[in-house]
Amino acid sequence: MAGTMGRLSVGVTGLQTSQYALNATAHNLINTQTEGYTRQQVLLTDQSYNRVATDSYYINNVGMGVVTAQIRQVRDQFADDTYRTESGRMSYYKAQYETVSEIENYFGELEGKDFNTTLNDMWTSMQELQKESNSIVTRSSFISNALTLIDRVQTIRSSLIEYQRNLNTEIKDQVKTVNDLASTIYELNQQIRAVEAGNVEKANDLKDKRNQALDKLSSIVNSEVVNNEDGTVEVYLEGHTLVTLGRTYTLTTQKVCENEKYQQNYGFTGSSTDFLMPVWEQDGDPLFNINRVPTADSNSDIGSLNGLMMSRGYFISNYTDVPTKPTKPLEKDFANNADYQTAMAQYEQDVKDYVKDLEYFNTYVEPYTITNLEAQFDVLIHAMVTQINDTLCPNKTVT
């Protein structure tokens, strides 16, 4: 009788574990359309054995059936890390794409007439003026096109600056989102740790919520996740701690011109603006390294917040921020050797200044979409105005 009951007991354990497995399958099917849900899998293991006989040659054990070892999530950490990296990279370039698309509107169909047409009209009227400088019609056409060009230039430049300032709002919103996600991850850490403390139950649904928060965080800023044995995670942003088991660290925004660490650590000397940048509230350290040009190899082209910063830049630029390569003097252009040597000495100094200015341009201007465009656009307009002035009012030596 005991043997029969023992076998029935073993069968009961099989039925029970099968029921658990069916419940897990049903749970998976119900949540197939649930965002962030991770498929769960039941792992089975042997129950304890009952020793019924033993001698010097063998031990005779009788199995007591099967039990559920755990219900685990079917996730691949490598796949998670890869997805978060590429999701962040997509968000980075999406932010820059949206900036470029907005800028194209300023130069394209702004006020129903693209900027290229305005330039062509101005150039045509200049040519006509050179042919018929005494014609009132030609002069009027030139003045009209010149006023139109000036108005368009002022409108485009003011639109670029206004767009830069408007990005402050997006930057503040994303910093707030990062802080909210950090708090969510921290709270879920505490709940998961409490549920799994007895090593009896797995907090799978809570982990799904945490993974959703981690996925969203990785799309905003480059993050690294470290899994702990107790089920909690630690999170790092750009090498700085964001979430630990004991606390969260907070980001805030600060005006670029008011952050001393940018001036000290990065040698940044950009003009004073009301542009905001993300910094760590605890020590004022900037979140991003302004001296680092983002690249895929270094995984520094990740996150929509970084994309916004690289789109906007840190200051308003103009043509003086674009270095002009000095022209080497020719000896034949000088009356004597002394004047030539003086010119060469000045040229050598100008080359040194040019190298320094070029380094500044490559670091603080060229990598930033709007800042670079402002500078290059100003160079174009400055050169055009100079040429117009030279054409209409040439410098002449009076003898």
For the regions a language model picked out, list residue spans one by one.
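Structural signature of extracellular appendage/secretion-system components
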Residues: M1-T399
